[in-house]
């Protein structure tokens, strides 16, 4: 089946749907790595990507943003020159009431009768001003980290803001 556009799931409309204990067939998350780079070093500058609006971010968008930011940081600073953390987890289970299309679909499908839907994906529910990504770097890689977060923000379905959490005096 074709993947639906993210605009179908972006807005938070209903109550949370996370109890996997009662569900069968929940697809696994594509996001596997939540800590990237050098996890042991202590970096003086921390930059964070914040969501400006309340929304749901699908696990595919989180993985695309993570890959983009990680690739930009790895090529510029190397594996040991940064630490990046993904701060949200896709707990929310998304459902879809599949519709049959084409000739004879009216005989096959039941329309809106029993329209609860099947589990198709997972998403992270994000509130306004919540941290999504944090990158810790040395001051010489600050511009690269900021650009990596900007690129990652373009993959997400909400407007984002980049703020410096720690080390503002070093990057002026």
Curated annotation (Swiss-Prot):
Q: Does the keyword Calcium apply?
A: no
Gene Ontology cellular-component terms for this entry are: ribonucleoprotein complex; ribosome
Keyword check for Ribonucleoprotein? yes
Q: Name one GO molecular function term.
A: structural constituent of ribosome
An example Pfam family from this entry, by short name, is Ribosomal_L16
Mention one GO biological process in which this protein takes part, according to its record: translation
The name this protein carries in UniProt is Large ribosomal subunit protein uL16
Which organism does this sequence originate in? Methanococcoides burtonii (strain DSM 6242 / NBRC 107633 / OCM 468 / ACE-M)
Q: What is the lineage of its organism?
A: Archaea, Methanobacteriati, Methanobacteriota, Stenosarchaea group, Methanomicrobia
Gene designation per UniProt: rpl10e
